Amino acid sequence: MSICIKDQIQNMNIVIGCTVGCTYCYARNNVKRWHMIDDFADPEFFPGKLKMMEKKRPQNFLLTGMSDLSGWKPEWRDEVFAKIRENPQHQFLFLTKRPDLLDFDTDLENAWFGVTVTRKAELWRIDALRKNVRAKHYHVTFEPLFDDPGTVDLSGINWIVVGTMTGAQSRKIHTEPEWAWPLADQAHKLGIPVFMKEDLAPIIGDENMIQEMPEEFNKVLEVQKSWKK
């Protein structure tokens, strides 16, 4: 049985709102439905949520489930990074679709910076990530994958995630197996772990799913198990 990535990585929505404007954005729909903020296109910072980082039980956190890192104000980013440094027991992930708008250096050992790539025309984002975000760890999320990305330069990347369209739109378009498999092969040749999201199981078969996590994330999950005993 495939693993749900949400069981391995917890959302911490410190910033809500995004200026990118993707037509298929689930976050915008959720914000509108639950009235989280007044205007999704005007991101808001919720520093009170930083207290969640103080818990001693290790956790893998995604900090951009309801935002894009490119839309964070520099002072928000600085405050979050300072808190991350104080809590090395956790691993933290960030995602952006606009790495061209970022420009910073960080030596954080437990922060992972990634880009979303949905089609071949967006492969430039990987190069922009490596150029504009000088960091210890990089990841790429190919989700939802709309076409065959072909040969991808994954040098310096530490993890890739592959997924398909979900929700009502999944009836119109989905990721093809012949797009996903070459990505996994390219990553494995470089020793990069691959995680196929659970929504791919009906497309490629549950028995064919590859669901690998970076060793740093696995260590967090192992410690979590010991805390439950």
Segments from the language model and where they lie:
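Short capping loops/turns at secondary-structure boundaries
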Residues: 118, 122, 173-176
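Active-site-proximal loop/turn and secondary-structure-junction residues that shape catalytic pockets
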Residues: 67, 98-100, 117-119, 144-146, ...
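Long, well-ordered alpha-helical scaffolding segments within enzyme catalytic domains
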Residues: 79-82, 129-137, 174-186
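Structural alpha-beta junctions
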Residues: 86-92, 134-137, 184-194
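Auxiliary Fe-S-binding modules of radical SAM enzymes
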Residues: 1-9, 146, 151-229
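Hydrophobic faces of well-ordered beta-strands that scaffold small-molecule active sites
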Residues: 61-63, 92-94, 113-115, 138-142, ...
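Conserved Radical SAM active-site core
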Residues: 1-112, 120-134, 149-154
